[in-house]
């Protein structure tokens, strides 16, 4: 399929169809029956109407043919659908991450805690949320916690009707992460597919479409349970701003939530990001999808070769460039180094990733590498 050219809409247009119709009429009936093809003629009106319909039909046929192949498709949603066939999920927008320093002006007699998902922000209003509880131990002045750009929402997205393969859309666009689905006060489990599950497994899968709308999909009652008729479905998700979250040092300085000590007293704290936030990226481009989907299929969902490591690193959200090197130094053996760059603050720029992003990438690669690597 490499090098496949798009079908060009040049062989037949409206004018060509009109001309072809007139020639066929002349050949079939001769000039004695119909020789007036001027635009004010009623017969010409019928020819023009037929040409309009035929022109439209040919356009859609060409378009359909182009959208049926990975190399020639131009619509993002069609590419997403084709990538499902080879097990590749195009990268959605990714939120930036950064380490946040949290400090107090003087030591406190008890621990001071800022709970997970507390909101902090830049002066421009860009919101970050802490990923874990941040605790300043008694007698200490500061601690650090990782934070991710974006805002978390919980929403009731619908009511089950008890049928197979129910789908529910999240109301907001810009979804970067679907965190939890709760039905009847019970959290259901995420699954990549329904293949290996039974009717008792309370599972769901998710999709984020070309317009960054999140969708929750349930199974058929055989390979995964169906939510009972009348049950409300609640979803918790994050909405982010992609590359805009790659903010400069010393810009995340506002606290939107409250820190408290062990007695429940409110404690004044300060926050700051001493490093660049990194890893924020826009949805994968159409050109990148066409390039990387075949490469990902060749990995067969495991890291073995040098190219596999590069492919999986590039597949991780927030990584703009990756290069895997084997035996870089003399006497090293089969040691693999992966050099990566994250997305910069502006589109088509790159930056050095922070430690938070690099550690997250290593955890991701651990799921696919060989046990001996």
Where are these regions (language model features)?
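Acidic, glycine-rich low-complexity/disordered segments
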Residues: 136-183, 197-198, 211, 215-216, ...
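Flexible glycine-/small-residue-rich
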Residues: 102-104, 220, 237, 326, ...
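Extracytoplasmic
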Residues: 95, 213, 333-335
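Carbohydrate-recognition loop of C-type lectin domains
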Residues: 2-21, 25, 300-373
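Residue-level signal for inorganic ion chemistry
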Residues: 117, 181, 313
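Immediate N-terminus of the mature polypeptide
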Residues: 1-71, 178, 186-268
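Extended assembly-interface regions of large multimeric machines
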Residues: 1-175
């Amino acid at each position: 399929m490499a090098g496949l050219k798009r079908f060009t809409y040049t062989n037949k247009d409206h004018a060509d169809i009109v001309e072809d119709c007139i020639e066929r009429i002349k050949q079939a009936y001769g000039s004695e029956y119909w020789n007036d093809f001027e635009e004010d003629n009623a017969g010409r009106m019928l020819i023009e109407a037929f040409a309009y319909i035929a022109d439209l039909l040919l356009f859609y046929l060409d378009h359909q043919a182009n959208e049926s192949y990975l190399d020639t498709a131009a619509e993002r949603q069609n590419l997403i659908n084709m990538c499902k066939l080879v097990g590749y999920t195009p990268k959605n927008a990714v939120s930036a991450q950064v380490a946040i320093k949290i400090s107090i002006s003087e030591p406190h007699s008890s621990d001071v805690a800022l709970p997970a998902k507390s909101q902090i922000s830049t002066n421009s209003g860009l919101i970050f949320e802490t990923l874990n509880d941040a605790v300043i131990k008694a007698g200490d002045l500061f601690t650090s916690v990782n934070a991710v750009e974006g805002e978390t929402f919980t929403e009731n997205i619908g009511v089950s009707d008890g049928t197979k393969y129910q789908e529910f859309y999240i109301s907001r666009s810009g979804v970067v992460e679907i965190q939890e689905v709760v039905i009847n006060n019970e959290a259901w489990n995420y699954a990549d597919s329904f293949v290996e599950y039974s009717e008792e497994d309370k599972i769901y899968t998710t999709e984020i479409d070309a317009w960054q709308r999140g969708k929750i999909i349930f199974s058929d009652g055989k390979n995964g349970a169906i939510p009972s008729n009348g049950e409300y479905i609640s979803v918790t998700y994050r909405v982010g701003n992609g590359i805009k979250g790659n903010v400069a040092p010393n810009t995340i300085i506002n606290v939107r939530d409250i820190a408290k000590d062990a007695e429940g007293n409110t404690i004044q704290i300060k926050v700051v990001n001493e490093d660049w936030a990194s890893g924020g990226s826009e949805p994968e481009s159409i050109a990148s999808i066409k390039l990387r989907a075949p490469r990902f299929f060749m990995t067969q969902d495991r890291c073995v070769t040098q190219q596999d490591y590069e492919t999986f690193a590039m597949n991780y959200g927030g990584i703009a460039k990756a290069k895997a090197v084997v035996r870089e130094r003399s006497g090293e053996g089969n040691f693999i180094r992966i050099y990566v760059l994250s997305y910069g603050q502006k589109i088509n720029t790159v930056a050095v990733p922070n430690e938070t992003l690099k550690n997250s990438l290593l955890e991701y690669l651990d799921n696919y590498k060989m046990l001996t690597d």
